[in-house]
């Protein structure tokens, strides 16, 4: 459960993420493909090389969806419903992959925000991304 303090931290840090959406999203995807190579199977048509236009574009979409979740942090289910449908029914992505990408995104935040990525911010983002992952996995039940 996100506290009001968590929500404030998430929104404050998100202002910094907005300046680097494509870069942070692409880096998180690249990290996921390296650390969890099985995730590449969902992107057979992508050029998976560093800095590929396809990865940058998809990374921007991922971070854009997270931005929508930040804007509507109190209504994640409705905000992410279409995305959940897409991943569950069309793409059939194993829900564990949402957690893997969440972890990689947190690594990117920590690497780029440095001292601003405090333990409190990390806990808030961990809870937020877990909530997003849970909502994206709702349609699988």
Swiss-Prot record:
Coiled coil: none annotated. Residues 1-141 form the Globin domain. GO terms for cellular component: blood microparticle; haptoglobin-hemoglobin complex; hemoglobin complex. Red blood cells. Keywords: Heme, Iron, Metal-binding, Oxygen transport, Transport. The keyword Nucleus does not apply. The keyword Transport applies. Heme b binds at residue 87. It holds the Pfam family Globin. Signal peptide: none annotated. InterPro entries: Globin, Globin-like_sf, Globin/Proto, Hemoglobin_a-typ, Hemoglobin_oxygen_transport. GO terms for biological process: hydrogen peroxide catabolic process. It comes from the Eukaryota. O2 binds at residue 58. GO terms for molecular function: haptoglobin binding; heme binding; metal ion binding; organic acid binding; oxygen binding; oxygen carrier activity; peroxidase activity. Hemoglobin A is the major, and hemoglobin D the minor hemoglobin of this species. Belongs to the globin family. Tetramer of two alpha chains and two beta chains. Involved in oxygen transport from the lung to the various peripheral tissues. PANTHER family: HEMOGLOBIN FAMILY MEMBER, HEMOGLOBIN SUBUNIT ZETA. This is Hemoglobin D subunit alpha. It comes from Aldabrachelys gigantea.
């Amino acid at each position: 459960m996100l506290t009001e303090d968590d929500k404030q931290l998430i929104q404050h840090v998100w202002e910094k993420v907005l300046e680097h959406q494509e870069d942070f999203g692409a880096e998180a995807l690249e990290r996921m493909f390296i650390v969890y190579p099985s995730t590449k199977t969902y992107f057979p048509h992508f050029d998976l090389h560093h800095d590929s236009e396809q990865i940058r574009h998809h990374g921007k979409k991922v971070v854009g969806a997270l931005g929508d979740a930040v804007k509507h942090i109190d209504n994640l289910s409705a905000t992410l419903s279409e995305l959940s449908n897409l991943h569950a029914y069309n793409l059939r992505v194993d829900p564990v992959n949402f957690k893997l990408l969440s972890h990689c995104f947190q690594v990117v935040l920590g690497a780029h925000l440095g001292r601003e990525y405090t333990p409190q911010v990390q806990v808030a983002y961990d809870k937020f991304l877990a909530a997003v992952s849970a909502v994206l996995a709702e349609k699988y039940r």
